[in-house]
């Protein structure tokens, strides 16, 4: 069929490959409480970032409404509209920080 032509001066025999030494199997990584919290924070961050464009508008409108309510009920006893506005504004600020500046490890 076909004729094999050997190159002159090459007399190398093919050696059998050395057997592969397998490294001992490592135990799977342990699931710790810290890794669980980190995974939960990462999940919450991803979901928050995905809904942030719409949520930012909704929460901002709510904060504006609470601001107007605070101005209207400024001297009314027992309403605590100022504290309610402060809490809503703090949540908006915290979420803005969480989405804008925080990035979880592993992403």
UniProtKB/Swiss-Prot annotation:
Q: Which UniProt keywords apply?
A: Plasmid
Q: What is the protein's species of origin?
A: Escherichia coli
What Pfam family does this protein match (any one)?
KleE
Q: Report the InterPro entries cross-referenced here.
A: KleE (IPR035362)
Q: Return the protein name.
A: Protein KleE
Q: Which domain of life is it from?
A: Bacteria
């Amino acid at each position: 069929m076909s004729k094999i032509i050997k190159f002159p001066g090459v007399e190398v025999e093919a050696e059998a490959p050395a057997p592969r030494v397998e490294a001992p199997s490592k135990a799977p990584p342990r699931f710790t409480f810290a890794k669980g919290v980190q995974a939960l924070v990462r999940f919450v961050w991803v979901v928050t970032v995905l809904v942030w464009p719409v949520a930012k508008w909704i929460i901002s409108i709510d904060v504006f409404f609470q601001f107007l309510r605070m101005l209207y009920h400024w001297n009314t006893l027992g309403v605590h509209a100022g504290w309610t506005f402060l809490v809503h504004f703090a949540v908006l600020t915290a979420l803005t920080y969480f989405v804008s500046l925080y990035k979880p490890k592993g992403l």
